[in-house]
Amino acid sequence: MFDINIQSSIRFDVDKVIYFDPIKLDERHDADYIFITHPHYDHFEKETILNLKNDYTKIIGPKDIYEVALEMGFSEDRIMTVMPNETYDLDDMNFKCVPAYNIDKPYHLKEYNWIGYVMEIAGIIYYIAGDTDALLENEDIICEVAMIPIGGTYTMNAREAATFVNKMKPKVVVPYHYGMVVGTEDDFKLFASLVDSSITVQRAYEKK
């Protein structure tokens, strides 16, 4: 259904191939859709996007990506800019963008209008959080699978993420965004130990 190669780089292979924040992937040109949460280098990597892009690929993200997407050869009708707290229809998909920002850190400011995504993929509702702190306004997101950053420094840390997830109550949580820039296997272990037993903790990638 999905795999995460590193950081927050997700690939869904269902009836279409959907990427979120792809980085460090070799040439394959198989993307139907590429969703971007924000333009930082570990989420929006030009080389990888060019490796995934084909003539039919559509790219979706905050307004910051628009000019770069044009430079990469996307036509205007294959670029979709989105905002938090809005719901969108794209082809046969419906998705909501939710806020992703830091409360007391300068790395991801609220006014940047960067985002996470809530989307049904192959009958399962996913929340892909992006780089964010544990926001009160996101605690009531309804999803079956939550993909949550736990690395700290630039996002919520393992303890904050566990508290957030326990309030959200998805069926499954996939902690990610650790092991590349910040965060270690110890953060995964701490997170897993603090998540309610009713929620399944699924590894994003191999031990870091």
Predicted regions and their residues:
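Binuclear metal-ion centers of metallo-dependent hydrolases, dominated by the metallo-beta-lactamase
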Residues: 1-3, 73-88, 139, 162, ...
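Active-site metal-binding motif and surrounding structural segment of the metallo-beta-lactamase
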Residues: 23-68, 142-147
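Active-site regions of enzymes building and remodeling cell-envelope glycoconjugates
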Residues: 31-38, 74-82, 94, 144, ...
